[in-house]
Amino acid sequence: MGDTALHLVAAPALEATGLQVARGGRPLFRGLGFRLARGGLLCVRGANGSGKTTLLRTLAGLSRPHRGRILRAGRCIRQAANDHRGTLQYRGHRDGLRGALTVLENLQWQAALYHHRPDREAVRTALAGMGMARHLDTLASQLSQGQRRRVVLASLALFPRCRLWLLDEPQAALDVEGAERFHALLARHCQEGGAVVACSHQHLRIGGIPCDELWLSDPAPAGARSAGDRVTGTEA
């Protein structure tokens, strides 16, 4: 009885109902819905131009859907915009690193946007998770694309209050070791009750983490869920 009651009242980390988004007057998707549980991972798949990045920006509150609602822990994000944006981390195609600043300076500057002041050791620890600690004082302009991607992903660990991660092609430019480190970072976040929506050309297989796939391409591959289906994660 008690377990059933808890299951009924537990709000998902993120929920979308009846989303419709268009670009240039052309609908990208309509009737999209999903429920993402705490500790869950939703992998958004689809061809180029299918609307993956647009969906991610809409979930982040950076763009408005033409129809439908997005709920965060049961609250509409339009009615709680500051709380929503202040407790999520969005990583797009562009890394946002300033070439004239060191890795340390870049991450401290980004953290300041969230009124957070990580010290040198905190930044080093975050970078170590992605194998980038030795580049703490390296100028961003001297990093390879793969190294820049590692820095961007490592910075996620600096924001423990941000329980929702929205990631656009997070594995782009990563080598095998970098991908393995990212998977470990992702697993740790989900095991601690965080939730992730990631747009990816590849399925994200993270051991022990429940992962649903949502395809924006029409038609979706056989056996896969399409944008019009309702995707439901396992509640924590």
Curated annotation (Swiss-Prot):
Superkingdom classification of source: Bacteria
Localisation per UniProt entry: Cell inner membrane
One CC-aspect GO term: plasma membrane
Keyword Membrane set for record: yes
A Pfam short name: ABC_tran
Family annotation (SMART domains): AAA (SM00382)
Biological processes, Gene Ontology terms: cytochrome complex assembly
Membrane topology: Peripheral membrane protein
Reaction(s) this enzyme catalyzes, per UniProt: heme b(in) + ATP + H2O = heme b(out) + ADP + phosphate + H(+)
NCBIfam families: ccmA (TIGR01189), PRK13538.1 (NF010061)
Name of the protein this chain belongs to: Cytochrome c biogenesis ATP-binding export protein CcmA
Organism: Alkalilimnicola ehrlichii (strain ATCC BAA-1101 / DSM 17681 / MLHE-1)
